From Swiss-Prot:
Pfam families: RUFY4 (PF25366), RUN (PF02759)
Binding locations of Zn(2+) 2: C537, C540, C559, C562
Positions with a binding annotation for Zn(2+) 1: C521, C524, C545, C548
Keyword Metal-binding assigned: yes
Species in which this protein is naturally found: Homo sapiens
InterPro entries: RUFY4, Run_dom, Run_dom_sf, Znf_FYVE-rel, Znf_FYVE_PHD, Znf_RING/FYVE/PHD
Region (Disordered): 174-207
GO molecular function ontology, one term from the record: zinc ion binding
Role according to the record: ARL8 effector that promotes the coupling of endolysosomes to dynein-dynactin for retrograde transport along microtubules. Acts by binding both GTP-bound ARL8 and dynein-dynactin. In nonneuronal cells, promotes concentration of endolysosomes in the juxtanuclear area. In hippocampal neurons, drives retrograde transport of endolysosomes from the axon to the soma. Positive regulator of macroautophagy in dendritic cells. Increases autophagic flux, probably by stimulating both autophagosome formation and facilitating tethering with lysosomes.
GO CC annotations, alphabetized: autophagosome; endolysosome
Protein name per Swiss-Prot or TrEMBL: RUN and FYVE domain-containing protein 4
Sequence intervals crossing the membrane: none
The entry's keywords: Autophagy, Coiled coil, Cytoplasmic vesicle, Lysosome, Metal-binding, Zinc, Zinc-finger
Length: 571
């Protein structure tokens, strides 16, 4: 169990390191450099994988061999790309196999060849078994496939590394920064802030440059991070709402890009907000009118980005409605107080009381408008011939008009900042759409390659079937020839037996002749002298004298027994 846990930990750590690289630097977010903490973690996991359960092999009078020697041997046998090997060997400052292996890993990462090189090295399973023990993940087909899939995912990430590192024999290059933070490390943790240090807000967020806010403002800004999206600005004063609104929208846009919410959480696009009166918040209608066609014009491939833009618009609308309601309530209270003061000033004049009643009725109908005409000016426009005798009333009217103009200017600034945020969201949507089109092109190319591979497979399958049929025909023909050869062998065996039997008969006859006395004639038993002629019989080989060979029925050189036997056969 412990060994299995160690193997799983090696592969799990490698997948986690690859996931961290993809999360921090994938999708064109920037290249991986030597200062990246994720690179240090990935290189360590790769080295641990290549050294896990490696068999000890030593060269003659040399140092212990490491995974660098395994990579060199495997690539040389597979006749793969030897460019990384030549590059590492050209580095004279690297003396140990460990440093050369690290340089090989960094070069393959920078060139996008790590997964391909490792796959070539693992094709020869016998060589892999010679270098690694049975517990190595490189010998398990399932884990090997998982590792290669993870490494192939790194081909889409750019690595800008310094390949001329002379100190790889000692350790990997150190790092100093990280782009992705673990959720377990940052969950429930907030950055510490000095109570005496004021917070600075740049001019791009709707306020003047380097404006210092007091501690109460800082605490309110911190509380906004934990408040719901529709109530984040409700607890701030009006001036701080105007400052923090663009900054809040930008933060919400970033959070919406980081977290993919389902479509059911957003309000449907295309619905216009119907207010109670026509002149209430007209700038919201302009904002929605400008944003709706831009988001609807995106292609089908950017549907996810459109949902983000739609959700951000809905959140902006909710925040603006809350802010608008607060401004309307505050404006209504202020105007009621001012109007009561004006009425007290105009109490001696009955004409002023009538004008106050008329203007008060108009105030009730148009008090909810933010960008409408000032209610005091509307009251005085009904009667051109009416004049205000008290100069203090004119001063109050002028102050109210100036306040309305200032509110209108601040709202226009907010509209500009909102349009800027919407423009950024549209640019992001366009970039996402372009990236999606590129991915669709790559997918189409891969599909075409797959179709070609399938056609080649069909052709090879047909050729294989044809070869199998030819092999079957040849097998049948060879069986027939083998049967004929077997018959021939049987015939040859029978002939050999016949020849052996004939040889035995001849040998027995020869033995019979040798047993006879060679000093007398076979026919007349005449003893041969030193000068007697001897004639062998042509049938049995016996010796005959001259008289027997010439006189016996004129048969030359044939003994009487053989001559009688021949006559018997003829008759």
């Amino acid at each position: 169990m412990a060994e299995e846990g160690a193997i799983l930990k090696v592969t799990k750590d490698l997948r986690a390191a690859v996931s961290a690289i993809l999360q921090g630097y994938g999708d064109g977010q920037g290249p991986v450099t030597d200062t990246s903490a994720e690179l240090h973690r990935l290189c360590g996991c790769l080295e641990l994988l290549l050294q896990f359960d490696q068999k000890e092999q030593k060269s003659f009078l040399g140092p212990r061999k490491d995974y660098w020697d395994f990579l060199c041997t495997a690539l040389r046998r597979q006749r793969g790309n030897m460019e990384p090997i030549h590059f590492v060997r050209s580095q004279d400052k690297l003396k140990t196999p460990l440093g050369k292996g690290r340089a090989f890993i960094r070069f393959c990462l920078a060139r996008g060849q790590l997964a391909e090189a490792l796959q070539l090295c693992l094709l020869n399973s016998e060589l892999t078994r010679e270098w690694y023990g049975p517990r190595s993940p490189l010998l398990c087909p399932e884990r090997q496939e998982d590792i290669l899939d993870s490494l192939y995912a790194l081909n889409g990430v750019a690595f800008e590394l310094d390949l001329q590192q002379p100190d790889l024999d000692g350790a990997w290059p150190m790092f100093s920064e990280s782009r992705c933070s673990s959720s377990t490390q940052t969950q429930g943790r907030r950055p510490r802030k000095n109570k005496d240090a004021p917070k600075k807000i740049p001019a791009a967020y709707g306020g003047p440059e380097n404006v210092q806010i007091e501690d109460s403002h800082t605490s309110q800004a911190i509380c906004l991070q934990d408040a719901p999206s529709g109530q984040q600005l409700a607890g701030l004063p009006r001036s701080q709402q105007q400052r923090h609104l663009p900054f809040f929208l930008e933060k919400k846009g970033e959070s919406s890009r980081k977290h993919r919410y389902p479509q059911s959480m957003w309000e449907p696009e295309g619905k216009e907000l119907q207010l109670d009166q026509e002149e209430r918040a007209p700038w919201i209608e302009i904002f929605l009118g400008n944003s709706t066609p831009s988001t609807q014009g995106q292609g089908k491939g950017a549907m996810g980005t459109q949902k983000e833009v739609i959700g951000m618009e809905a959140e902006v609308t909710g925040v603006l409605l809350v802010a608008e309601g607060q401004r309307t309530t505050e404006g209504t209270h202020k105007k009621e107080a001012e109007w009561s003061h004006v009425q007290r000033l105009l109490m001696p004049s009955p004409r002023g009381a009538v004008e106050g009643a008329v203007s008060g009725s108009r105030q009730g109908s148009g008090g909810s408008s933010i960008l409408g005409e000032p209610w005091v000016l509307q009251g005085h426009a009904t009667k051109e011939d009416s004049t205000v005798e008290n100069p203090q009333v004119q001063t109050e009217v002028t102050l109210v008009a100036r306040r309305e103009e200032q509110a209108e200017v601040s709202l226009q600034d907010e509209i500009k900042s909102l349009r800027l945020g919407l423009r950024k969201a549209e640019e992001q949507a366009q970039r996402q759409e372009q990236l999606l089109r590129e991915q669709e092109g790559e997918l189409q190319a891969l599909r075409e390659q797959l179709s070609r591979c399938q056609e080649e497979r069909a052709e090879l399958q047909a050729q294989l079937e044809q070869k199998q049929q030819e092999a079957e025909r040849r097998d049948a023909m060879y069986q027939e020839e083998l049967g004929g050869q077997r018959d021939l062998v049987q015939a040859m065996k029978r002939r050999v037996l016949e020849l052996i039997q004939e040889k035995d008969r001849l040998w027995q006859r020869l033995q019979h002749l040798s047993s006879m006395a060679p000093e007398c004639c076979v026919a007349c038993s005449k003893i041969f002298g030193r000068f007697s002629r001897r004639y062998p019989c042509r049938l049995c080989g016996g010796l005959l004298c001259h008289a027997c060979s010439m006189d016996y029925k004129k048969r030359d050189r044939c003994c009487p027994p053989c001559a009688q036997g021949r006559e018997a056969q003829v008759t």
